[in-house]
Design a protein with these regions (language model features):
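Flexible, glycine-rich loop/tail regions that form catalytic "lids" or insertion modules at the edges
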Residues: 1-115
Length: 115
């Protein structure tokens, strides 16, 4: 995609959009049950070393390493408790009006009360 041999897909377009925001000084915060990989495994925002010795090591977030002057990019894999997480993220967004705060609903065949 970067070389121009393939069309830009949704995941790449989303990554470019987030990169442009954090490079412009606008923090981005995404939360949801599968936010790191994306609900359809399209995002790859958090990369994991499959050979790590501890569960709390071996994760890398490329969008946190664009430049020394960029804004923060935070991805949170939350618990499956939509109402509580959405309420928290709404409050967070209200107190941080200059930050892009996204709550990503989990996709599935179940009723999601927060939606």
């Amino acid at each position: 995609m970067a070389a121009g041999t393939q069309a830009i897909d949704w995941g790449m377009a989303e990554t470019l959009a987030y990169a442009s925001l954090v490079e412009s000084g606008h923090p981005v915060r995404i939360s949801g049950e599968d936010s790191g990989r994306g609900t359809f495994a399209h995002r790859h925002a958090v990369l994991h070393d499959q050979n790590r010795e501890r569960w709390d090591q071996g994760s890398y977030v490329p969008l946190r390493h664009l430049s020394d002057t960029q804004a923060d990019f935070l991805v949170i894999d939350s618990i499956l408790n939509e109402e509580a997480v959405l309420a928290y993220e709404y409050g967070y967004a209200c107190s941080s009006p200059n930050e892009l705060v996204i709550w990503e609903a989990q996709f599935g065949d179940f009723a999601n009360g927060a939606q």
